[in-house]
Regions:
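Non-catalytic, mostly N-terminal accessory regions of nucleic-acid modification and defense proteins
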Residues: 1-169
Length: 169
């Protein structure tokens, strides 16, 4: 599945969630999720290049420690957190921590804080949120040059969707 169809599929999942109302909210939801996913993959590269690299995101809130699917003993991909626990974790722990991150000593922390300052988690259904995360896990790999090259396609699609959102955005 290409990135554009993955984004469309994710938006279709979000349409089923009672908390997400309109394209503007779907785009906002997808933006912060993509940010954390892509940032995590960049951090993996930085860790490979520098063994002393320290993430500006508290360990508990890094994508790899709550969203990334892990293989069980049978080789099946499983979420680290159950749907019923996911929304409370995001709303009560992840968002407050990233909105209040001390950005005084790091430009990277400042970017993280700015991304989350005005962001919201609109999704209310943890199972649907897990379905979105699973799609991101399956399709978005920015270590792959082809995927990186298609990032512009994602951006263009999101802009077109936002334009189509009209006054809702």
């Amino acid at each position: 599945m290409n990135i554009s169809s993955t984004i469309k599929s994710i938006q279709d999942i979000m349409r089923k969630d009672d908390g997400v109302d309109g394209d503007a909210q779907r785009i906002g939801q997808l933006t912060w999720m993509l940010f954390l996913k892509v940032f995590e993959q960049r951090e993996e590269e930085w860790e490979d290049d520098n063994s002393k690299y320290k993430s500006p995101i508290p360990e508990k809130f890094r994508w790899r420690n709550w969203a990334k699917y892990l293989e069980d003993a049978d080789g099946k991909k499983k979420p680290q957190i159950q749907g019923s626990e996911l929304i409370p974790f995001i709303n009560n722990e992840l968002f407050p921590a990233l909105k209040e991150i001390d950005a005084s000593d790091s430009p990277t922390k400042k970017v993280i804080k700015q991304v989350f300052e005005d962001s919201n988690n609109y999704m209310k259904n943890g199972s649907l949120m897990l379905a979105v995360i699973e799609k991101l896990e399956e399709a978005i790999n920015f270590h792959d040059f082809k995927t990186r090259a298609h990032l512009g396609d994602v951006y263009e699609q999101l802009l077109n969707d936002l334009r189509g959102a009209g006054n809702a955005g």
